[in-house]
A protein has these predicted regions:
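N-terminal single-pass transmembrane signal-anchor helix
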Residues: 15-50
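Conserved hydrophobic beta-strand within the GNAT/NAT acetyltransferase core sheet
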Residues: 25-28, 69, 143
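Alpha-helix exit/C-cap motif
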Residues: 48, 52-56, 63-85
């Protein structure tokens, strides 16, 4: 040390204080707790808006498929009943043959990664018993979730060429138009 430098002098009982920059552990824990509470409140709302968006995507895909079925009907005087697997590969149901190329989209969006629903088309039920109308008279298009986590409250959205709309819940029970849950399917 140089001879002309002096050390700081302190009065008796004085302590040299240094100012530390940063947060205490308690402050950090309070902030983490607040963020956790906000996330617990916001996440269910976010999930419900994603479900609503997916249902809207399915309804739009059903409307598009119904229009395609009507165009198909005007050209061939019959509707095309088909089923599709989870990958969106569709095949006509008996006794029809599967046209090539397949004229309808079997997923609710263009890419299989973005598609939450698989589309199908079946003959309309008669309304009495277990019979169905011929595909030359009526067709019912439906959208079912590709996985159970897509929409746990609505299992199947359906609309027929007669204009009748319906849906089923997670237990496969038909949700009636008079039921408050029907607005989940068709607002």
């Amino acid at each position: 040390m140089a001879a002309n430098q002096q050390l700081p002098r302190f009065e008796t009982g004085q302590v040299m204080r240094t100012k530390n920059a940063g947060f205490t552990l308690i402050e950090v824990m309070v902030v983490v707790a607040i963020i956790g509470i906000l996330a617990a409140i916001a996440y269910p709302s976010y999930q419900e808006s994603v479900r609503k968006g997916r249902r809207a995507q399915a309804r739009a895909a059903l409307a598009d498929l119904l229009q395609q079925q009507e165009r198909y009907f005007t050209q061939r005087n019959t509707y095309l009943a088909f089923t599709s697997d989870n990958a969106g590969v569709a095949s006509a149901t008996f006794p029809q043959t599967t046209p090539s190329p397949f004229p309808f989209r079997a997923l609710s969006s263009d890419g299989s990664v973005n598609s939450a629903y698989v589309l199908e088309s079946n003959a309309c039920p008669t309304g009495t018993g277990s019979g169905v109308l011929p595909v030359t008279e009526c067709i019912r298009v439906s959208a079912k979730p590709r996985t159970a986590t897509v929409d746990p409250s609505v299992k199947l959205l359906m609309v027929a060429t007669t204009g009748e709309k319906s849906c089923t819940d997670a237990t496969n029970a038909v949700i009636l138009k008079t039921d408050a849950k029907f607005k989940l399917c068709w607002p």
